[in-house]
């Protein structure tokens, strides 16, 4: 099939219908995620693929709620996966610019909740924890961004358990953060604060769906992506899933002319497991990947 013919075969209406069908709710190892995998199984089957499903063990973490107040005023915050819960942590709040978090003295931050800038990132939390901080609150953009605060790639091993942070973490909006910084300055640099977070971290079975269009030999090209999502996740990553389905629909009628197979592999455990699903699947299929996988195209946030 010529490139122009492939483009002409793309059905934009069908693509959007697939996105809507996949967006059954926030997909974080819950019923909405199961529904999305059921939808994908039907879509790939209808496209003409051979479909299989697996469940692999993986460690995931979901934020369940957070509350934060400083100087008697409550602020809307989000907490983050792979951080500990905190039940009413009370401490003085101080502001440390993010470019000083690695050089701040223990005297400045020890026993305090630190307000700082940017996305909730593990290296920043680690630097402040090492200096004795009791918790960290990040000032993000106008919208509060979901982030996973971990350097552990995939599920933990005995060697990486110590790499998780040990203090609670939350984020608030840029507007609230700017106003809070002004209040801190007016108060002489500190305010009494209280931080509560609830994070559920657990081992679970991570679903993976594989849809294949068989070519003539055992070598294959992969198209991969994650199904789990923060919120409805239309862009991240129902769009990528829908494009995989549409590509399968276009390629399936050409199977008899294909030398190599095309394998579509979609998993959970990406956003809330820091790649636990993809890591577990690659471990389980390592020998086959090593011998026969020629190329992987990861479809994530397409159309953004």
Predicted features, each with a name:
Residues 2-13, 17-110:
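Noncatalytic luminal/extracellular "stalk/propeptide" segments of secretory-pathway proteins
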Residues 53, 113-116, 135-138, 169-171, ...:
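Structural recognition of the beta-strand scaffold that forms the well-ordered cores
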Residues 123, 205-208, 229-304:
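Acidic/histidine-rich catalytic neighborhood of metal-dependent amide-processing enzymes
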Residues 125-134, 151-158, 281-288:
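Mature extracellular/periplasmic domains of secretome proteins
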